[in-house]
Design a protein with these regions (language model features):
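Macromolecular interaction modules
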Residues: 1-106
Length: 106
């Protein structure tokens, strides 16, 4: 499994609530249509002044699957357009998963 990790800074004029509402609206509807998508998680950072406001993690079988999915023209344009409604900047990284704890023993 490969994770595509997006580190997101919100538009400065948005409150935390507005940021989350815009992110989880139409943008997520485009993301749900990405071919080969195995999972999508959004995390909103807490604290007084975190370096990022949110982290998005999408999961695919391979990096090639992720790159193909984000290259679908209609989806890429829709994701870009809706992202611009909540994000001032986004940094994207790929990470391979190495599970070290998968279930806590009692």
């Amino acid at each position: 499994m490969i994770r595509r990790i997006s580190l997101v800074r919100k538009l400065p004029e948005l409150t935390r609530e507005e940021f989350l509402a815009r992110w989880t609206g139409e943008h997520v509807e485009f993301a749900r249509r990405l071919p080969g998508l195995r999972g999508y998680v959004i995390q909103i950072l807490e604290g007084d002044d975190p370096p990022y406001d949110g982290i998005a993690i999408t999961t695919f079988d391979t990096r090639e699957d992720a790159e193909r999915a984000f290259a679908v023209p209609e989806l890429a344009e829709g994701l870009r357009r809706t992202r611009d409604e909540f994000a001032a900047s986004v940094e994207v990284y790929f990470a391979e998963e190495y599970p070290v704890v998968t279930e806590q023993e009692e």
